[in-house]
Amino acid sequence: FESVKAGAWYFDAVLEAFRDELMVGMSETEFSPGAPMTRAMLVAVLHRLAGSPSVSGKMPFTDVASGTWYYDAVLWASQNGIVAGRSETTFAPQENITREQIVAIFSRYTAKFSPDKTTAAAELTGFADSASVSDWALDDMKWAVAYKVINGSPSDGKLYLNPQGNATRAEVATILMQYRAL
């Protein structure tokens, strides 16, 4: 990919995610590491990580049309309790996904497929913005930090979780590779 240069902090993660067919490019030559990750993209990655199991049944979300590239992934994730919609009938597939939403989804994925790896929890006091983690995501963030799925980003001599921030494709590739190392 033209946008993924050797030596970039995300280079190895993007290479591994692409090589293992967990993430795809935005085109044949562009990965777009700085582009925001959407809810549909993340669910597709996890569906691939699970081996792209076949699905059947009724889609609960009216904004996920049959035939879209993410349809099977959303149906699979919904049926397995890995994702919830923005409402009972809306998934918002093109909505950017935040870092705390990502760790919540990875935590649910782990509870479903590797429940033995859900017991640890870390304190978040080492992160300057730990108070900004939403209450609903607090246990998931503690889990992600304990298992080093998320390490935080350094700035001004402090570490930040940036839980409300939209995740980039490079960040998700990195989180994915750290998750696979569990």
Annotate each language-model stretch with its function.
Residues 103:
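IQ-motif-like calmodulin-binding regions
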Residues 12-14:
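Thiotemplate assembly-line natural product biosynthesis machinery
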Residues 147-149:
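Short, charged, amphipathic alpha-helices and their helix-cap/turn boundaries
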Residues 1-9, 24-43, 47-73, 80-100, ...:
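Feature responds to low-complexity, polar/acidic, surface-exposed segments characteristic
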